[in-house]
Swiss-Prot record:
Probably acts as a transcriptional activator. Binds to the GCC-box pathogenesis-related promoter element. May be involved in the regulation of gene expression by stress factors and by components of stress signal transduction pathways. It is found in: Nucleus. InterPro entries: AP2/ERF_dom, AP2/ERF_dom_sf, DNA-bd_dom_sf. Belongs to the AP2/ERF transcription factor family. ERF subfamily. The keyword Cell membrane does not apply. PANTHER family: ETHYLENE-RESPONSIVE TRANSCRIPTION FACTOR ERF008, ETHYLENE-RESPONSIVE TRANSCRIPTION FACTOR RAP2-1-RELATED. Residues 163-176 have a biased composition (Acidic residues). GO terms for molecular function: DNA-binding transcription factor activity; transcription cis-regulatory region binding. The gene is ERF008. CDD domains: AP2. Residues 27-84 bind DNA. The keyword Transcription applies. This is Ethylene-responsive transcription factor ERF008.
Length: 176
């Protein structure tokens, strides 16, 4: 009778998700999610108690790629990575590995570059269902219509031109 109760308690705990919460919130090594939804990455320096802050990112993949870059620079090709296939071509001579001259600031800068690239790629996703339906759409973010009806990228670092501002540039959708 006690075994049945233990089995029932184990099954109930497993179906309720008790004990699996931490694994669900951290899909990759070296990252965590803030209360407000941003993903952050950090790594401990070898043989020290201090941590290297790698940045805050919109997606867990970007934070994980930043962590992978940092761990590769710190520990070399033998490091356990979240995405080992993406760093397979790099060697110690290409910049990664146990170089004694690598400062925390250098590692932070390199990791932030990679994370920012992944975030930027995720922000400009092009959806193309491409098919026989007449309702196929292609959505492009950060764009505006040019004079000939085509779409062109907008430089988000520049102030908007008051002459071309008509209020319709919130979202560009081009019918295919």
């Amino acid at each position: 009778m006690e075994t049945e109760a233990a089995v029932t308690a184990t099954v109930t705990a497993a179906t309720m998700g008790i004990g699996t919460r931490k694994r669900d919130l951290k899909p990759y090594k070296g990252i965590r999610m803030r209360k407000w939804g941003k993903w952050v990455a950090e790594i401990r320096e070898p043989n020290k108690r201090s941590r290297i802050w790698l940045g805050s990112y919109a997606t867990p993949e970007a934070a994980a790629r930043a962590y992978d870059t940092a761990v590769f620079y710190l520990r070399g090709p033998s490091a356990r990575l979240n995405f080992p296939e993406l760093l397979a071509g790099l060697t110690v001579s290409n910049g990664g590995g146990r170089g004694g001259d690598l400062s925390a600031a250098y590692i932070r800068r390199k990791a932030a570059e990679v994370g920012a690239q992944v975030d930027a790629l995720g922000a400009t996703v092009v959806v193309n269902t491409g098919g026989e339906n007449r309702g196929d759409y292609e959505k492009i973010e950060n764009c505006r219509k040019s004079g000939n009806g085509s779409l062109e990228r907008v430089d988000l670092n520049k102030l908007p031109d008051p002459e071309n501002s008509d209020g319709d540039d919130d979202e560009c959708v081009k019918r295919r």
